[in-house]
């Protein structure tokens, strides 16, 4: 039996709270069960140097975990003087995922930065970050439309993400920490609302997985992402 008596294809309870802080153009607290991430979107009228004069915008992301977001305190990366490899990998994943949902030409020469700060971690922090940041990005874009900066909406569609894996020989969706730490296979899937995939990250932690198991995991991920899209749309009032 899974934690909280969930079915194998059942994600954790998802809660998305918009306008969680008052300063950012977009601000969301996203909760996947006990995993909680604050996602904020900041709009700047500037683009990276390599995009100057190109007539298009940019979407990027940063990711971090609060020192006591886990069972024992972690040292802040700022105190170490550099970001770890895991952090850089995750924030690049978040940024790639969010750029897929935006027509960068229609955004114009401006940049939107999504900051994803993990308040409490219980597995799936990167997938929760992508899910919450997508909503915060929509709010930031809507603020540009409302103030007349943008005439057309550059959002091409929502993006969501979920973890799947094989635990005790069973394919399961949205792994909690205790499942993730014991998984034979661990996979993160990022999808567009139309079903196209942005990223699939899969690793056999124990036994290699078969082609049939891969297809089963991808089907589970699609089911889970579809439920997340419903939560995102409800949060946005769409």
Swiss-Prot record:
Keywords annotated in UniProt: Nucleotidyltransferase, RNA-binding, rRNA processing, Transferase, tRNA processing, tRNA-binding
Domain of life: Bacteria
Gene Ontology MF terms: 3'-5'-RNA exonuclease activity; tRNA binding; tRNA nucleotidyltransferase activity
Keyword Nucleotidyltransferase: yes
Main EC class the enzyme belongs to: transferase
Subunit structure comment from the entry: Homohexameric ring arranged as a trimer of dimers.
Role description: Phosphorolytic 3'-5' exoribonuclease that plays an important role in tRNA 3'-end maturation. Removes nucleotide residues following the 3'-CCA terminus of tRNAs; can also add nucleotides to the ends of RNA molecules by using nucleoside diphosphates as substrates, but this may not be physiologically important. Probably plays a role in initiation of 16S rRNA degradation (leading to ribosome degradation) during starvation.
Protein name in UniProt: Ribonuclease PH
Upper taxonomic lineage: Bacteria, Pseudomonadati, Pseudomonadota, Gammaproteobacteria, Pasteurellales
Protein encoded by which gene: rph
């Amino acid at each position: 039996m899974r934690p909280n008596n969930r079915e194998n294809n059942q994600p954790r309870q998802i809660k998305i709270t918009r306008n969680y802080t008052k300063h950012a153009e977009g601000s969301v607290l996203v909760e996947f069960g006990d995993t909680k991430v604050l996602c904020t979107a900041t709009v700047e009228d500037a683009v990276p140097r390599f995009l100057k004069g190109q007539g298009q915008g940019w979407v990027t992301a940063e990711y971090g975990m609060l020192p006591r977001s886990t069972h024992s305190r972690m040292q802040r990366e700022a105190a170490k003087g550099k970001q770890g490899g895991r952090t850089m990998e995750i924030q690049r994943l978040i940024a790639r995922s969010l750029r897929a949902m935006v027509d960068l030409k229609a955004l114009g020469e401006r940049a939107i930065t999504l900051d994803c700060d993990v308040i409490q971690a219980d597995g799936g922090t990167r997938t929760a970050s992508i899910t919450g940041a997508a909503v915060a990005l929509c709010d930031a874009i809507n603020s540009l439309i409302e103030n007349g900066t943008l005439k057309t909406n550059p959002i091409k569609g929502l993006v969501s993400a979920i973890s799947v894996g094989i635990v005790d020989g069973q394919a399961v969706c949205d792994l909690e920490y205790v499942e993730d730490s014991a998984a034979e296979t661990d996979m993160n899937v990022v999808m567009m609302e139309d079903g196209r995939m942005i990223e699939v990250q899969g690793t056999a932690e124990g036994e290699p997985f078969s082609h049939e198991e891969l297809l089963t995991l991808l089907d589970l991920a699609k089911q889970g992402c579809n439920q997340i899209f419903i939560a995102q749309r409800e949060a946005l009032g769409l």
